[in-house]
UniProtKB/Swiss-Prot annotation:
Top-rank taxon, per record: Eukaryota
Enzyme type, top EC level: hydrolase
Post-translational modification note: Some glutamate residues at the C-terminus are polyglycylated, resulting in polyglycine chains on the gamma-carboxyl group. Glycylation is mainly limited to tubulin incorporated into axonemes (cilia and flagella) whereas glutamylation is prevalent in neuronal cells, centrioles, axonemes, and the mitotic spindle. Both modifications can coexist on the same protein on adjacent residues, and lowering polyglycylation levels increases polyglutamylation, and reciprocally. The precise function of polyglycylation is still unclear.
Reaction it catalyzes: GTP + H2O = GDP + phosphate + H(+)
Chain spans, region Disordered: 431-450
Site (Involved in polymerization): Y450
Family classification: Belongs to the tubulin family.
Subcellular compartments: Cytoplasm, Cytoskeleton
Designated name of the protein: Tubulin alpha chain
Function: Tubulin is the major constituent of microtubules, a cylinder consisting of laterally associated linear protofilaments composed of alpha- and beta-tubulin heterodimers. Microtubules grow by the addition of GTP-tubulin dimers to the microtubule end, where a stabilizing cap forms. Below the cap, tubulin dimers are in GDP-bound state, owing to GTPase activity of alpha-tubulin.
Subcellular location, principal: cytoplasm
Amino acid sequence: MREVISMHVGQAGVQMGNACWELYCLEHGIQPDGQMPSDKTCGGGDDSFNTFFSETGAGKHVPRAIFVDLEPTVIDEVRTGIYRQLFHPEQLITGKEDAANNYARGHYTIGKEIIDIVLDRTRKLADQCTGLQGFLIFHSFGGGTGSGFTSLLMERLSVDYGKKSKLEFAVYPAPQVSTAVVEPYNSILTTHTTLEHSDCAFMVDNEAIYDICRRNLDIERPSYTNLNRLIGQIVSSITASLRFDGALNVDLTEFQTNLVPYPRIHFPLATYAPVISAEKAYHEQLSVADITNACFEPANQMVKCDPRHGKYMACCLLYRGDVVPKDVNSAIAAIKTKRSIQFVDWCPTGFKVGINYQPPTVVPGGDLAKVQRAVCMLSNTTAIAEAWARLDHKFDLMYAKRAFVHWYVGEGMEEGEFSEAREDMAALEKDYEEVGTDSVGEEDEEGEEY
């Protein structure tokens, strides 16, 4: 079996986790108490969904997941919520005091008190696996726990499970709206620390998802539940090939192989289509070509940046539902003829396709319409450098005045870590710039680079 363990860190990670597991349960017909009437093989059968759920002798299905937060309120909602029987109490780990939006608290002072418990529980989950494939880590960049504790966890997971892949789903600070003043500090510190430990990081930003909810679903004031359910659909699409049998299945390492050309350039953009409300879907039939084209619209992206200014290095199209390879091929051929979509010259083909026959499931009473087919596109484009540049600029404005730095130093960090992290980010921006430049005629100087 190729099991995957999900780690949900901090408020954002936990709330994304709630949305994801709610959706997984619906997709597999697992009830909130973990029973699965449709499952005939009692005890650990070799069904595809066992990558995400372990089975007890009593026929209960338990998510292979760990929820961690340094303060209890958010996880307490899971403990008392509708899915409280789904999780083993040991999978829900909370501290007493929160990280207070401070990376240093999450990574050093408060985080180190809880990290050993988390790793111990992770070890228990890993021991139940026959062939652990890797970890999915859900967190935000802006919060103290999401940034600080995640980076500590990633470092420790690298030590304990060296070769296992680690994929992140990270909430990137939105360009305009912000939940914390110190988001740029936390984001840059966490990106720097986890850069060498993460194999692939899918970023979503709240503002981009707000806009999608407003524009496509006509929700005037989207709540976090609306946002998380949309993120849940994306995560579900990415993991569908691990949980169902399909025509072209994609496993965790395959994503990395196809999306990550250089170890540091591992931040693909996610785009999902169709995002459409039930009223509209009733009146239109969306073909494979329609949803494929929608993926190349910047408006449907989960991070605010414009791929038309950048170049694509790799692109992964994950279809689910009523899709046949012939339709996909013609849709891709049509895309390739468009001038607005540019690939780097050293990656001529650039499309990887996955097809899964399980149609997308929607949460009853949710905002998304039930559709016959959907696609999630993961593209590694140089345009994401815009997002880093934006963040670096905000960091610079604050750091020039050393604003708020004393909170970090007071928790045992050194000021040198800030400048080190910022230099690493500058290098990352430069890496993206170099990857985007055409390779012809520059081979001689580039030789010693990689």
